[in-house]
Curated annotation (Swiss-Prot):
CDD domains: IFab. GO terms for cellular component: extracellular space. Its main location: secreted. It is found in: Secreted. This is Interferon type A1/A2. Disulfide bonds join 32-129, 61-155, 68-168. InterPro entries: 4_helix_cytokine-like_core, Interferon_alpha/beta/delta. One of its GO terms (biological process) is adaptive immune response. It comes from Gallus gallus (Chicken). Residues 1-31 form the signal peptide. The gene is IFNA1. Keywords: Antiviral defense, Cytokine, Disulfide bond, Glycoprotein, Secreted, Signal.
Length: 193
């Protein structure tokens, strides 16, 4: 006669649950840890590519009055997840605007492609990190921050259209992109130290 299996002890379930939780946390940590070394160089290298991509214009540009202001104090956060989401959103908008087929002829296309590839790779790494951290955190991203960023980039697109995608209008956008890379540097530097 077979001996009936003894029922599993409740502590056994607790240990199993704890093991699974620790494994999930370790996966999340490893998915995000690879960003730390990249954070240190991403903005600096991107700024260098942006500078190399768009040499100085042969003519002086008139002062453009683009009403695309952005209150950068809205970006202040010590929450790594929120900083990652914000950085991801900014990079998606930068990628979209800089990959436009109407960029000026004097821009170095290979440098622009290198910058776009860099943005794309970093965005993918952020997506992996955000996807893995979704398993343990469901904090909501401030909607007004998302809308403010979206409104700013929409304004830049309109500005380009209104100025017929002129080289001077693109110079204004390039300067805005420079400011965004500096914001990203501050976001990632403040939350991963």
């Amino acid at each position: 006669m077979a001996v009936p299996a003894s029922p599993q002890h409740p502590r056994g379930y607790g240990i199993l649950l704890l093991t699974l939780l620790l494994k999930a946390l370790a996966t999340t940590a490893s998915a995000c840890n690879h960003l730390r070394p990249q954070d240190a160089t991403f903005s600096h290298d991107s700024l260098q590519l942006l500078r190399d991509m768009a040499p100085t214009l042969p003519q002086l540009c008139p002062q453009h009055n683009a009403s695309c202001s952005f209150n950068d104090t809205i970006l202040d956060t010590s929450n790594t997840r929120q900083a990652d989401k914000t950085t991801h959103d900014i990079l998606q908008h930068l990628f979209k605007i800089l990959s436009s087929p109407s960029t000026p002829a004097h821009w170095n296309d290979s440098q622009r492609q290198s910058l776009l590839n860099r943005i794309h790779r970093y965005t993918q790494h952020l997506e992996q990190c955000l996807d893995s951290s979704d398993t343990r955190s469901r904090t909501r991203w401030p909607r007004n921050l998302h809308l403010t960023i979206k409104k700013h980039f929409s304004c830049l697109h309109t500005f380009l259209q209104d100025n017929d995608y002129s080289a001077c209008a693109w110079e204004h956008v390039r300067l805005q992109a420079r400011a965004w890379f500096l914001h990203i540097h501050n976001l990632t530097g403040n939350t991963r130290t």
